[in-house]
């Protein structure tokens, strides 16, 4: 979706506005036995390992038109993964042979693709000046948190994503791609704009585009799938949207067990547990037993 600017601004110097889009994405399931819970954690840990997360972030950089400076990734034991990517708005000139450059960028996002959709070795390249330069650059990060409860049979997977940019590039362009990449049951999205930029007359601008809700930038077909609630603080350029998947098919939430294998009473109890878990995460508070 097009990011509509307030009006055409002639800026004095660099656009110093920092725009940050943050997600907490949740996948919920019911795993009946300890073996099923262990298998779910192993499955989700492999499904969203650091390599796949890296490829998702490379595509995000492509979508928003950013250049990749550096990628750091890590898979954790016993579970979880993290990827951090430093990006910049413009291509940073470098001289690899002499080790010179003003930031030493790897290059555009496409430079990190081997041609098979996977991140190449050059994405791990960190030329000396890059670390010192990153404070005035933008970044994309993702961290995953698989977990399960031994008594209730509920297992959850959470992915935290931050896309922070400065300059003219906007993280909102990657909004729909990120939502679709994780196919989550619950999405908590935050968008904020910080700092200011000036026009040539010296007037400060604290935001440079039109927005009254994150929902403005979510595709119609996605909006139709989710129940959504907004909490926005317009005067502070803070926008918050919660999303809960409308459709509930028990089969989609069972891991290692089919719905037909359960007794009617079991189905009802499991459905109640799952819905309670989802509403608690969606609302951000525990729901007492009635």
From Swiss-Prot:
Similarity comment text for this entry: Belongs to the prokaryotic AdoMetDC family. Type 2 subfamily.
Active site (catalytic residues): 138, 143, 166
InterPro entries listed in its UniProt record: AdoMetDC_fam_prok, S-AdoMet_deCO2ase_bac, S-AdoMet_deCO2ase_core
UniProt GO BP: spermidine biosynthetic process
Keyword annotations of the record: Autocatalytic cleavage, Decarboxylase, Lyase, Polyamine biosynthesis, Pyruvate, S-adenosyl-L-methionine, Schiff base, Spermidine biosynthesis, Zymogen
Cofactor, free-text remark: Binds 1 pyruvoyl group covalently per subunit.
Cofactor(s) required for function per UniProt: pyruvate
Molecular function in Gene Ontology: adenosylmethionine decarboxylase activity
Known function: Catalyzes the decarboxylation of S-adenosylmethionine to S-adenosylmethioninamine (dcAdoMet), the propylamine donor required for the synthesis of the polyamines spermine and spermidine from the diamine putrescine.
Gene (UniProt): speD
Keyword Repeat in record: no
Pfam family, one: AdoMet_dc
Oligomeric and partner information: Heterooctamer of four alpha and four beta chains arranged as a tetramer of alpha/beta heterodimers.
Pyruvic acid (Ser) modifications at: 138
Pathway the protein contributes to: Amine and polyamine biosynthesis; S-adenosylmethioninamine biosynthesis; S-adenosylmethioninamine from S-adenosyl-L-methionine: step 1/1
Catalytic activity: S-adenosyl-L-methionine + H(+) = S-adenosyl 3-(methylsulfanyl)propylamine + CO2
GO CC annotations, alphabetized: cytosol
UniProt site positions, description: Cleavage (non-hydrolytic): 137-138
Enzyme kind, highest EC tier: lyase
Record's comment on post-translational modification: Is synthesized initially as an inactive proenzyme. Formation of the active enzyme involves a self-maturation process in which the active site pyruvoyl group is generated from an internal serine residue via an autocatalytic post-translational modification. Two non-identical subunits are generated from the proenzyme in this reaction, and the pyruvate is formed at the N-terminus of the alpha chain, which is derived from the carboxyl end of the proenzyme.
Known EC number: 4.1.1.50
The protein, known as: S-adenosylmethionine decarboxylase proenzyme
């Amino acid at each position: 979706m097009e990011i509509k600017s307030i009006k055409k601004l002639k800026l004095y110097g660099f656009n110093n506005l920092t725009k940050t889009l943050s997600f907490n994405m949740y996948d919920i399931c019911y795993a009946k036995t300890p073996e099923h819970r262990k298998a779910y954690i192993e499955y989700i840990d492999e499904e969203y390992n650091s390599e796949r997360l890296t490829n998702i972030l490379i595509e995000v950089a492509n979508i928003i038109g950013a250049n990749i400076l550096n990628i750091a990734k890590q898979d954790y034991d016993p579970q979880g993964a993290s990827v951090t990517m430093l990006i910049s708005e413009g291509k940073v000139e470098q001289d690899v042979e002499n080790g010179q450059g003003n930031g030493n960028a790897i290059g555009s996002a496409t430079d990190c693709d081997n041609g098979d959709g996977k991140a190449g070795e050059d994405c791990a390249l960190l030329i000396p000046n890059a670390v010192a330069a990153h404070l005035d650059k933008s970044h994309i990060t993702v961290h995953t948190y698989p977990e399960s409860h031994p008594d209730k049979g509920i297992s959850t997977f959470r992915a935290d994503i931050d896309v922070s940019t400065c300059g003219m590039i906007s993280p909102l362009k990657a909004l729909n791609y990120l939502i679709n990449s994780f196919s989550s049951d619950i999405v908590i999205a935050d968008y904020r704009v910080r700092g200011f930029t000036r026009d040539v007359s010296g007037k400060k601008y604290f935001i440079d585009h039109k927005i009254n809700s994150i929902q403005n930038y979510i595709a119609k077909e996605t909006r139709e799938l989710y129940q959504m609630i907004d909490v926005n603080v317009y005067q502070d350029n803070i926008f918050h949207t919660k999303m809960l998947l409308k459709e509930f098919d028990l089969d989609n939430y069972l891991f290692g067990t089919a719905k037909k294998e359960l007794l009617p009473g079991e189905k009802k109890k499991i459905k109640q547990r799952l819905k309670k878990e989802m509403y608690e995460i969606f609302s951000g508070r525990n729901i007492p037993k009635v």
